[in-house]
């Protein structure tokens, strides 16, 4: 319940800073944001830091782990530069999205859903596969969508193989 409430509070705070919900081209913007969300994930797996850099601002923030949702600390907080280093080193070799939706607020979009990920780094094979439920924030700047922020709202949940995390 706390995790759900934290996500709702976060969404309300972010939405409150933007324009009203929707617009004449809301469905086009929604499709564009969802496509960009996937393109970013694909670029991360490819190690395409140039593309990821082109759609993230210098004040980008990525909060890993859901400890923050109940008063604790996140596992890690990335800036744009530390996240780009992770992209360059191809930390993730799988980043598959599912259940992703977009909530549109004029020139602000919140995407939320889950991804399954795999990394070859680390000594513990039981922590190489994981699932994460997330919220991401985008803003339309100068006619294009920019990826501002990512927050884990549940997870990561680790497992030894894809199947062990696919229902988490």
Predicted regions and their residues:
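Bacterial N-terminal signal peptides that target proteins for export
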Residues: 1-8
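Short, low-complexity N-terminal intrinsically disordered segments enriched in polar/charged residues
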Residues: 10-12, 18-59, 107, 148, ...
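A solvent-exposed, acidic/Ser-Thr-rich amphipathic alpha-helical stretch
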Residues: 28-34, 49-105, 114, 126-130, ...
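Short hydrophobic/aromatic-rich beta-strand segments that constitute the beta-sheet cores
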Residues: 62-63, 111, 147-149
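A short, structured loop/turn motif at beta-sheet edges
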Residues: 102-109, 125, 138-145
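Short glycine/acidic-enriched loop and turn motifs that connect beta-strands
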Residues: 117-118
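A short, polar/proline- and glycine-enriched secondary-structure boundary/capping micro-motif
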Residues: 121-124, 157-162
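Short beta-strand edge/turn micro-motifs at domain boundaries
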Residues: 131-158
């Amino acid at each position: 319940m706390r995790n759900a409430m934290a996500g709702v509070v976060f969404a309300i705070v972010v939405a409150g800073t933007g324009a009203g919900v929707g617009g004449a081209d809301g469905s086009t913007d929604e499709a564009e944001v969802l496509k960009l969300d996937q393109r970013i994930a694909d670029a991360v797996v490819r190690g395409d830091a140039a593309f990821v850099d082109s759609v993230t601002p210098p004040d980008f923030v990525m909060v890993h782990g859901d400890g923050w949702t109940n008063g604790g600390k996140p596992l890690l907080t990335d800036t744009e530069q530390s996240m780009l280093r992770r992209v360059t080193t191809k930390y993730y070799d799988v980043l598959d999205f599912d259940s992703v939706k977009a909530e549109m607020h004029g020139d602000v979009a919140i995407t939320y859903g889950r991804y399954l990920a795999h990394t070859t780094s680390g000594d513990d094979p039981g922590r190489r596969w994981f699932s994460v439920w997330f919220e991401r924030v985008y803003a339309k700047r100068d006619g294009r969508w920019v990826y501002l922020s990512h927050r884990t709202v549940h997870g990561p949940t680790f497992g030894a193989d894809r199947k062990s995390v696919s229902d988490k």
